[in-house]
């Protein structure tokens, strides 16, 4: 916390949640945890599909999307507050997707904000789900396992992903000479926003978050921070010759203040100049805090993908490296505890893919009959809900297709972004609701595989929490997860836990609470309901899960990289 101690009574903290499609701002009462108001604004360029090529797995965000959406969201929400409430805003916390890094120049400006790079996707933020760096990730993994160096992937699950910091930097550096020559460093989105608002974007002034550095950047205290110069140079000399080395050494947990909002940003956002910026972290880590997570509770943040967070104590973990996950980092969730991350690369995105597939005739009809567009759009928007209801009325598992949930690769266990979705066991009687039931089961099977990855390595899971829009709005899907995992599944009573977690850290940084656990007791959200496994369905899903595992073992070798034959 800061040196200033303020009363939580009446104090308001803002949480900024930068998602894949939009930014959300949430105003929270620091004393009682009341969610006072919220606003969501979509990214305008992203909404138009600019700078993205889905077929090449390229997904980029222009920094102006973040700036414009954030400014609009905060200003619109602040206008609805009373003047007294506005003056009682004490802090802003920030979470974002990750790894979502961007190149910056000597002044700390993201390159795409410069006229010479304004429309260059390589000068923008490389979104978490961008998989253009698969080959670079494999290079990093080979070097980690070569024996030439220590295994710097040891504490990130043993597999470095194409979704992460160094793989993306390496890919862009090689693909774009102009970006390579202009960039002196790279920054994660969750670190950039607090730096932007506090005027600390110069590379030497940036406060790097423990969460992003430990989970995605190979930072670990046992080797003094980032991997040594020789390791990065062995990947590509540009990583140490063209970029600052070390890019950073120290990292900070998110309750530490980054600085005070600048006068310019206070005026632009309609906020007091006394507002404190807390450190940034990834959305799901802050979501776990907002959900009130306790040690050995698996928190599933469910959206387009999932991120699974678990907190463990150092005594139980010791010096063990937990294999197959996305990292174990002290302080990445709660200070003093080891935060562990896992996840599924596609959850809601799988359902959306299926909906888009079935909607093709609707789109064609809308082109030929424009006057039908309103009705066709309504049918499309209700499609997933209709499929879910139809399957729930007759959830037969006798002929359920077995689907592998690798439509966007696999994050956990053992990250592998080369993998593709697989649909098996179709017959002439398979209809759309039944196939959608296979998709629901697939996402639940992926969730169970993550749970077993922890438990098989003596990391117990005492409780399972689910949060996010799907968790609250889709009881059928959540019941399948409870049945497949054979665990009670607690549903958190908020769609805004990530923003709430960010607000909790802001409250601590501003001095409204002494520490994060105290702030959680006052501000974290409650459990809305608990789903209990159905013993009959548990047995039936167990048989399907075994088939799922068999298909996983059969299918994965087919996606191994092809060895190039040199003649």
Swiss-Prot record:
GO terms for molecular function: ATP binding; D-ribulokinase activity; ribulokinase activity. Its EC number is 2.7.1.16. GO terms for biological process: L-arabinose catabolic process to xylulose 5-phosphate. SUPFAM superfamilies: Actin-like ATPase domain. CDD domains: ASKHA_NBD_FGGY_L-RBK. Gene3D superfamilies: 1.20.58.2240, 3.30.420.40. InterPro entries: ATPase_NBD (IPR043129), FGGY_C (IPR018485), Ribulokinase (IPR005929). It catalyses: D-ribulose + ATP = D-ribulose 5-phosphate + ADP + H(+); L-ribulose + ATP = L-ribulose 5-phosphate + ADP + H(+). Keywords: Arabinose catabolism, ATP-binding, Carbohydrate metabolism, Kinase, Nucleotide-binding, Transferase. Pathway: Carbohydrate degradation; L-arabinose degradation via L-ribulose; D-xylulose 5-phosphate from L-arabinose (bacterial route): step 2/3. GO terms for cellular component: cytoplasm. PANTHER family: FGGY CARBOHYDRATE KINASE DOMAIN-CONTAINING PROTEIN, RIBULOKINASE. NCBIfam families: L-ribulokinase, PRK04123.1. Belongs to the ribulokinase family. This is Ribulokinase. It comes from Yersinia pestis bv. Antiqua (strain Antiqua). The gene is araB.
């Amino acid at each position: 916390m800061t040196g200033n101690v303020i009363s939580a009574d009446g104090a308001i903290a803002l949480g900024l949640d930068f998602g894949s499609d939009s930014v959300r701002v949430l105003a929270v009462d620091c004393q009682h945890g009341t969610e006072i108001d919220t606003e969501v604004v979509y990214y305008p360029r992203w909404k138009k599909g600019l700078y993205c090529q889905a077929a090449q797995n390229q997904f980029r965000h222009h920094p102006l999307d973040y700036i414009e959406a954030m400014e609009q969201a905060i200003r619109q929400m602040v206008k609805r507050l009373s003047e007294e409430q506005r003056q009682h805003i004490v802090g802003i916390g920030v979470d974002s997707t990750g790894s979502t890094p961007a190149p910056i120049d000597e002044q700390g400006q993201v390159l795409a904000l410069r006229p010479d790079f304004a429309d260059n996707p390589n000068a923008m933020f490389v979104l978490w789900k961008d998989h253009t760096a698969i080959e670079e990730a494999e290079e990093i993994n080979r070097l980690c396992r070569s024996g030439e160096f220590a295994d710097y992937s040891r504490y990130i699950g043993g597999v470095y992903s194409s979704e992460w910091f160094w793989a993306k930097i390496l890919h862009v550096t090689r693909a774009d000479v102009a970006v390579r020559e202009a960039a002196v460093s790279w920054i994660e989105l969750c670190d950039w926003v607090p730096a932007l608002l506090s005027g600390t974007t110069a590379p030497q002034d940036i406060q790097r978050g423990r969460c992003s550095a430990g989970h995605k950047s190979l930072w670990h205290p046992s080797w003094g921070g980032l991997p040594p110069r020789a390791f990065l140079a062995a990947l590509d000399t540009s990583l140490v010759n063209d970029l600052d080395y070390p890019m950073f050494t120290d990292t900070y947990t998110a309750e530490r203040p980054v600085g005070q909002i600048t006068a310019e940003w206070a005026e632009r956002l309609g906020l007091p100049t006394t507002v404190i910026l807390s450190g940034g972290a990834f959305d799901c880590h802050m979501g776990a805090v907002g959900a009130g997570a306790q040690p050995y509770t698996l928190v599933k943040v469910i959206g387009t993908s999932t991120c699974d967070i678990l907190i463990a104590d150092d005594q139980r973990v010791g010096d063990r490296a937990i294999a197959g996950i996305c990292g174990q980092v002290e302080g990445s969730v709660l200070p003093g505890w080891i935060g562990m991350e896992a996840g599924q690369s596609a959850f809601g995105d799988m359902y959306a893919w299926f909906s888009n597939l079935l909607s093709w005739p609707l789109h064609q009809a809308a082109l030929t009959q424009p006057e039908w567009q309103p009705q066709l759009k309504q049918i499309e928007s209700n499609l997933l809900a209709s499929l879910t209801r139809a399957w729930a009325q007759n959830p037969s598992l006798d002929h359920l297709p077995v689907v592998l949930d690798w439509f966007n690769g696999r994050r956990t266990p053992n990250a592998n972004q080369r993998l593709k979705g697989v649909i098996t066991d179709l017959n002439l009687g398979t209809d759309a609701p039944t196939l959608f039931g296979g998709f629901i089961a697939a996402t639940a099977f992926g969730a169970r595989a993550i749970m077993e990855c922890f438990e098989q390595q003596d990391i117990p899971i005492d409780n399972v929490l689910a949060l996010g829009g799907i968790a609250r709005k889709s009881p059928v899907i959540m019941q399948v997860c409870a049945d497949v995992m054979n665990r009670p599944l607690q549903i958190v009573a908020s769609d805004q836990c990530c923003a709430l977690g960010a607000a909790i850290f802001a409250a601590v940084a501003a001095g409204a609470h002494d520490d994060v656990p105290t702030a959680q007791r006052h501000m974290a959200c409650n459990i809305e309901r608990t789903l209990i496994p159905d013993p009959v369905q548990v047995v039936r899903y167990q048989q399907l899960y075994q088939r799922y595992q068999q298909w996983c073992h059969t299918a994965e070798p087919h996606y191994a990289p092809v060895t190039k034959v040199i003649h």
